[in-house]
Structure formats: structure tokens, C-alpha cells
Amino acid sequence: DAATGGLQRVSLTAGGGERNQGTESASRVVAPALSGDGRWVAFATTASNMVAGDTNGKQDVFVVNIATGAVSRASTTASGVQGDGDSPIGQGERPSLSYDGGLVAFSTAAGNLGTSPGNVLARNLGNGALLALSSQSGGAVGAPVSSRTGAYVVFGASTALDARYPGNSGLFSRFTGLQRAWWWID
């Protein structure tokens, strides 16, 4: 808490209550991502009570406004359809936030969020748009990292995503279309 310098719990439900454990063990470490401005945190959990209507029984990505406690689920379509697989793919894999928390990127095992299972998605938290950053079938992707503005996301892939490099895995960068202006006053 910036005002008091005290400790603040941010993994509470949208109603301010305790999250249930879902299918995860009580000792599971939740791997959070913090926005560069310190206002937003993203994390994954199988808890089914973080937001109303979470009935998919899968691991989902949630974003919390630290100042207000508002919680939103990022791993749904723009119209609210729940993923049919875990997001991110592995327990302990963390989502990535842009500096201002306007974009969250994550891997997904869901096949109904605009791409096949095993790809990387990005949610524009400003307008709710969900963008498929990769569209491979087979192989594995993960560990997305957002640029400061959210305009680019870099992630690893175990199969070639670019026809110029057949058969090669590696790191790939994708433009998200998110454009922001940044101003600093020193």
C-alpha cells in the first residue's frame, strides 16, 4: 500500500472475500505479474469464485486493480465465453502485463478463444479485445513478455511460426496493434 507502506493482499475475489482453491493445492505458489506503474497485478488460479460466472473449472488469468480491488478475468472472449482449457498452460507460468496494465498476454490450452490450444493470446483491457498472437497447431508456446507500451509481445515457441525458418523453434515477436504515447516529467 503506497499510502501507508503496509502490506496489502491483492488475491481476493471481486467481492473482497477469500478465493477458493479450485483444483490447485493449498501450497501452490501463484506466480504474479506486476505492471510497471505498480497499479495492476495479473495471476492465474483455478479458484472458481474470483468473479461471478466462473464455471469452467479451468485455470484462468485474472487482473486486479490494486487501488480499487476490482477484479476482471482476462482469459475469456470479448463476449465473455470461458476458455475450455487452462490459461496459462502450466501451473506456475505467469501472464505478462504492459507497463500501464493495459495489455495482458498469456499462453492458453483453450481451443475456443480464437486459436487452437497451445498458443499465446493478448487481452486489451481498455476495449476488451482478445488477440491471438500465435496460431500454431502442435508444439508448445509460452513465457510471453510484453513491451512497455504493450505494442509488442515476445514469446517462445517449440515449433517454427515463421515459414522463412522451417523446423526451427525460437523466440518470436508479435505486434499487437496497441499504440500508446508516453510522457515523462522529471
Give, region by region, the residue ranges found by the protein language model.
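Conserved "turn/edge" positions that cap or connect secondary-structure elements
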Residues: 1-186
